[in-house]
């Protein structure tokens, strides 16, 4: 099964994008107007929003983790607000990585909770206030840029360098969550992750709008176990090709790949199929940290499968060594100005 985003979204506009243009115009009018006119409620903590222009994977999770680590290194106590995509909690919930499963809270919150307290709620203000009651002094909003349900002191929009914003059309004709011009007006800075020229257009738009542009790479953090081996790599994330490339960067030979939908809930037949395919070709099985979190909390996954499954985690590294600290400083300074202004 492929990603939830239709493949044509990431190609040049074709007849499908043209046929869906009227629906996209309506969607864009509504989403753009909501974004521009919104006056989100505020909390008495500095808030950094890590979002993206499109649906699908761009690198928000490793970016949020990098900022959580950076805040901790400065002596701060960050908390992360998330909607918990893929989970089924409808109220306020503090993620417990030792007991919660991905089916209940989502895979990304489980990963994030390894680094900072994560509060799930459709009411982002309530989640932020709850984290404040736990002693958190810095809020990272995982996604939520377009919903405008919590004021952000700084909105960092993440884009994948190879895919960019796809065909540049709004849902359902393309992957944009709202018209790019409307989103750019509310963007404080752009973070381009990886190598490639797919994001050249959005980078030019950000430059014309006077927005700072940062660059970063995803570096494999466990290369020693990957290098020199032949792999069947599988992933259920927004942009699986990025993961396969990371395996190659870590020195692994990717012989076979198998892509599932983003946040995919694996079935026993899926696991048997992967094991059989790997066994026939003498390959090791490797997946992402996000997929491993889902698999490890599913009741039907055999322990022996998990014990043999390799996991490639990645860390975000800014090209400019002072970039992360500069953004954190800006968030705090804007919060202080808001508080005393």
Curated annotation (Swiss-Prot):
Protein origin, superkingdom: Bacteria
Residues annotated as binding ATP: 54-61
Catalytic activity, as annotated: a lipid A disaccharide + ATP = a lipid IVA + ADP + H(+)
One Pfam family of this chain: LpxK
GO biological process: lipid A biosynthetic process; lipopolysaccharide core region biosynthetic process
Chain coiled-coil ranges: none
GO function terms (MF aspect): ATP binding; tetraacyldisaccharide 4'-kinase activity
GO cellular component terms attached to this protein's record: plasma membrane
EC class (word): transferase
Documented EC number(s): 2.7.1.130
Pathway: Glycolipid biosynthesis; lipid IV(A) biosynthesis; lipid IV(A) from (3R)-3-hydroxytetradecanoyl-[acyl-carrier-protein] and UDP-N-acetyl-alpha-D-glucosamine: step 6/6
Keyword terms: ATP-binding, Kinase, Lipid A biosynthesis, Lipid biosynthesis, Lipid metabolism, Nucleotide-binding, Transferase
HAMAP family, alphabetized: LpxK
NCBIfam families: lpxK
Family: Belongs to the LpxK family.
Role, per record: Transfers the gamma-phosphate of ATP to the 4'-position of a tetraacyldisaccharide 1-phosphate intermediate (termed DS-1-P) to form tetraacyldisaccharide 1,4'-bis-phosphate (lipid IVA).
Protein name: Tetraacyldisaccharide 4'-kinase
Gene that this polypeptide is encoded by: lpxK
């Amino acid at each position: 099964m492929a990603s939830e985003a239709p493949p044509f979204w990431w190609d040049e506009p074709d007849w499908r994008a043209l046929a869906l243009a009227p629906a996209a115009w309506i969607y864009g009018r509504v989403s753009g107007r909501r974004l521009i006119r919104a006056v989100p409620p505020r909390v008495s903590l500095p808030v950094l929003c890590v979002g993206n222009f499109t649906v699908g994977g761009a690198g928000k999770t490793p970016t949020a983790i990098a900022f959580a680590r950076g805040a901790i290194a400065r002596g701060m106590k960050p908390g992360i607000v998330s909607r918990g995509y893929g989970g089924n909690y409808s109220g306020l919930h503090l993620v417990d990585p030792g007991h919660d499963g991905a089916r209940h809270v989502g895979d990304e919150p489980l990963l994030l909770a390894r680094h900072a307290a994560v509060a799930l709620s459709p009411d982002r203000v309530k989640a932020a206030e709850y984290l404040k009651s736990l002693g958190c002094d810095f809020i990272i909003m995982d996604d939520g840029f377009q919903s405008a349900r919590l004021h952000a002191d700084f909105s960092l929009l993440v884009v994948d360098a190879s895919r960019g914003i796809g065909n540049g059309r709004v849902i359902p004709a393309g992957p944009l969550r709202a018209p790019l011009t409307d989103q750019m007006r509310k963007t404080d800075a752009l973070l381009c992750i990886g190598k490639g020229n797919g994001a050249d257009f959005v980078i030019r738009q950000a430059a014309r709008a006077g927005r700072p542009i940062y660059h970063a790479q995803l570096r494999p953090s466990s290369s020693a176990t990957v290098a020199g081996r032949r792999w069947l790599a599988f992933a259920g994330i927004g942009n699986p090709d990025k993961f396969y490339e990371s395996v190659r960067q870590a020195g692994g030979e990717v012989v076979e790949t198998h892509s599932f939908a983003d946040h995919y809930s694996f079935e026993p037949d899926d696991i048997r199929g992967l094991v059989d395919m790997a066994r026939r070709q003498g390959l090791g099985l490797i997946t992402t940290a996000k997929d491993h979190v889902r698999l490890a909390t599913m009741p039907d996954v055999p322990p022996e499968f998990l014990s043999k499954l390799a996991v490639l985690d990645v860390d975000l590294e800014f090209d400019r060594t002072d970039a992360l600290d500069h953004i954190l400083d800006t968030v705090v300074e804007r919060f202080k100005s808001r508080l005393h202004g």
